[in-house]
């Protein structure tokens, strides 16, 4: 999701609802605010995709699995067995930036937390996930703030 949707749709964007990952406080893992801060410092803007936390965790999971099973021979060539890699992925558990990461036997490794957001005005300068568009579902509770 990006501010371009507001510019492209103009006034028609007001009231438009979209599903997107829940990035409100408490919905992601404890490391999420640090990821957003470091990303913003590096690139000059916050991530525009709600899937950045899951992508980051997927990369961490892959690196942990590779570190666990990679074998290097005498010539310096590194080998990664497919079955060993798959088996390693299924055993790794960690607290990711998107929340707890642990793969089930079908390869689902994270619990996706969707939310519904609604655009409240047509001014592109007001774009900020959680503000415009604002989260309308699930309701934010005091314990998740």
Spans of model-derived segments:
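Extracytosolic ligand-binding ectodomains
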Residues: 1-145
């Amino acid at each position: 999701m990006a501010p371009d949707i507001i510019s492209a749709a103009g006034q028609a964007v007001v009231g438009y609802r979209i599903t997107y990952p829940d990035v409100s406080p408490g919905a992601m893992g404890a490391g999420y605010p640090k990821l957003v801060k470091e990303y913003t410092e590096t690139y000059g803007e916050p991530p525009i995709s709600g899937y950045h936390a899951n992508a980051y965790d997927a990369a961490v999971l892959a690196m942990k699995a590779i570190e666990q099973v990679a074998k290097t021979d005498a010539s310096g060539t590194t080998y990664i067995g497919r079955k060993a890699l798959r088996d390693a992925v299924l055993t790794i558990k960690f607290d990711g930036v998107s929340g707890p990461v642990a793969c089930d036997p079908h390869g689902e490794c994270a619990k996706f937390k969707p939310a519904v957001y609604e655009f409240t005005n047509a001014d592109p300068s007001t774009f900020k996930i959680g503000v415009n568009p604002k989260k309308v579902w699930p309701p934010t509770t005091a314990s998740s703030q």
